Amino acid sequence: MLYPPGAPARIPLAAITGTNGKTTTSRMLAHILKSSGHVVGMTSTGGVQIDGRITVKGDMTGPQSAQIVLRDPTIDFAVLETARGGILRSGLGYSECDVAACINVTSDHMGLGGIDTLEQLAKVKETVVRIANDTVVLNADDKLCLKMADNCRAKHLCYITMDATHGLVREHIRANGRAVVLEKGINGDMITIYDNGAHIPLLWSHLIPATIEGKAMHNVQNAMFAAAMAFSFNTDLDAIRMGLRTFDTSFFQSPGRTNVYNEHPFKVILDYAHNQASFRAMADLADRL
């Protein structure tokens, strides 16, 4: 029988929104999942990818792009970057997801589509968070992201913080909640997962090539989001570690995102940065290089 009763009709779906970091986090998560044996369909500002191969080029972060991926019969996992513009124009392109993340909410595209304040922008991005069934991953260092926790229907809430002393996150951990925390250690900064009372040291941040020896703090945060989402899909811990340790910022693996060139007497950083927060991230990286 081609479609026996009770046969699964859906695949796991991860949705990623926010102002900055969506594309890199999507690429990181897709790489982790592919490394662990999945055939991943992904949408991002770089195009539609099926199993690591670009099938449609361009900014593909809207509902039509999501439908391209979800209609593909060869994939067993979907990672969908979901941007503000597509939501305002035509919605999401999917009715629910398993795991959703909002990385941050900062000023970008203001004055377009009737969005004039950060609070209005946050409400648009919250659309993704509201439809997650299993886990919502939120930036605890961003007040607008934190407010989204009040409107989650998901079974689990996972906080991401770069501040190991964050009071709310520590309280969440004590209540057996899930969190990914950047903690200082003798060898550097350790990305640590807390879940249901367990304390799991995952990986030193400087061992992730995309962080450029731990200097690209924005990519440390992106890696924490990717790890949290992969963990929420019950991905093997060693597969998460291996995925992050084999993801770099070369033009071939992450075009247009923190590509550093050393072929000249000076360093060149190629990045898609186009708003104040992303410019600050690039300036911070330049100071650390």
Task: Please identify what each model-predicted range represents.
Residues 115-122, 153-280:
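Adenine nucleotide phosphate-binding catalytic loops in nucleotide-utilizing enzymes
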Residues 8, 285-289:
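Glycine-rich phosphate/diphosphate-binding loops that line cofactor/substrate pockets in enzymes
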Residues 1-15, 24-37, 245, 252:
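Short, basic phosphate-binding NTP loop
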Residues 22-25, 222:
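Conserved lysine of the Walker
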